[in-house]
Amino acid sequence: MLQNSELLQEYLPIAIFFGIALLVSGLIMILPNLLSTKKYNKDKLEPYECGFEPFSDARSKFDIRFYLVAILFIIFDLEIAFLVPWAISLNMIGKIGFFSMIFFLFVLTIGFIYEWKKGALDW
């Protein structure tokens, strides 16, 4: 079993690495704020909207359906992220991997049908 001094000696390079990483990342975040010139004007503080004047305030409320569509997009985007490696390694993972992905797709399909029946996709 290692004694305390030997244990500290083995972890010293890792501690030094984390210390330097924290120092460098802190400097990268702080130095631009200290060294940059700050010129505030009305045009720089306005939101950009395709070259036109903004029609309304950028911080207006959105309909909840936009959030539901965004969440559904993320869920099905992650489904593709799981399907591609699964399809590539299908011959190596065997029947267990095949049926586990079929179960995963079944659960996602049930969730999609539920969202559809609840009217989350109706506008």
Swiss-Prot record:
Q: Name one GO molecular function term.
A: NADH dehydrogenase (ubiquinone) activity
User: What parts of the sequence cross the membrane?
Assistant: 11-31, 68-88, 93-113
Q: What is its main location?
A: membrane
| Intracellular or extracellular location(s) | Cell inner membrane
Q: Which GO terms describe its cellular component?
A: NADH dehydrogenase complex; plasma membrane
Catalysed reactions, semicolon-separated: a quinone + NADH + 5 H(+)(in) = a quinol + NAD(+) + 4 H(+)(out)
Q: Provide this UniProt record's keywords sorted from A to Z.
A: Cell inner membrane, Cell membrane, Membrane, NAD, Quinone, Translocase, Transmembrane, Transmembrane helix, Transport, Ubiquinone
Q: Does the keyword Cell inner membrane apply?
A: yes
What is the topology of this protein in the membrane according to its UniProt annotation?
Answer: Multi-pass membrane protein
Q: What is its EC number?
A: 7.1.1.-
Record family assignment: Belongs to the complex I subunit 3 family.
Q: What does this protein do?
A: NDH-1 shuttles electrons from NADH, via FMN and iron-sulfur (Fe-S) centers, to quinones in the respiratory chain. The immediate electron acceptor for the enzyme in this species is believed to be ubiquinone. Couples the redox reaction to proton translocation (for every two electrons transferred, four hydrogen ions are translocated across the cytoplasmic membrane), and thus conserves the redox energy in a proton gradient.
By its UniProt entry, which HAMAP family does this protein fall under? NDH1_NuoA
Q: How does it assemble?
A: NDH-1 is composed of 14 different subunits. Subunits NuoA, H, J, K, L, M, N constitute the membrane sector of the complex.
Q: What is this protein called?
A: NADH-quinone oxidoreductase subunit A
- What is the scientific name of the source organism? Rickettsia felis (strain ATCC VR-1525 / URRWXCal2)
